[in-house]
Amino acid sequence: MEKRVRLILGLACGCLAGAAQANDFGITAKLGTLGMGVEGIFGLTDQFNARLGFNRFDFDRTETIDDIKYNLDLKLKTVSLLADWHPFGSAFRFTAGLMNNGNELSGASATDGLTVGDTFYPDVGLNAKLDFDATSPYLGIGWGNALAADKGWGFNMDLGVLYQGSGNVTLIPTGANASLVSPADIAAEEQRFEDDIKNYKYYPVFSFGVSYKF
């Protein structure tokens, strides 16, 4: 994971060097399915920009997975390095890049008894954790070029897909009889959990924001 973070930071430094030569810079505040975020926008050429951003949002929800009710805490956290191509210098753009993906889902069930795998265990609950590939590719389209004007305010929108992998599930038994839960039942329950959330492999990204060019 550290190597991947260093790779993203190294690419970002290259973008910053190119932006310094181009002498174009802007910022964006945005809101979307990755949470609330801020981006620096760096002009590379008349048609290409680079963006370095950070997104974060936390919220709680209750969800039933494989007939087990969990109180879940969803933490969205990504660091993005994106390249925008504006054909003919237009506002429309194609976007590709990488995100350091810290998105994570964690939570717990009640400890009054439940079925783990195919076995019912009284006075048992489960703590759950779900995370994804540390480095995730992104592809999308969008509208808005903050660096097109001499300076001032603008609006932008992104629509795309973040491929974050199948997800890694860890379940830990809790409660008075936690020690009785067999590893085989835990492994079976983890597989069912992963099957239930397999659609999270492709995470839809939509955002809109306000930008300013200096």
What positions do the PLM features span?
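Repeated loop/turn-to-beta-strand initiation elements of outer-membrane beta-barrel proteins
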Residues: 25, 48-50, 91-94, 153
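Solvent-exposed loop/turn segments connecting transmembrane beta-strands
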Residues: 27-42, 149, 200-202
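Extracellular/periplasm-exposed beta-strand and loop segments of Gram-negative cell-envelope proteins
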Residues: 54-81, 103-136, 165-205
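Residues on the lipid-exposed face of transmembrane beta-strands in outer-membrane beta-barrel proteins
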Residues: 29, 38-42, 81-85, 96, ...
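Transmembrane beta-strands of outer-membrane beta-barrel pores
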Residues: 31-35, 54-60, 87, 98-104, ...
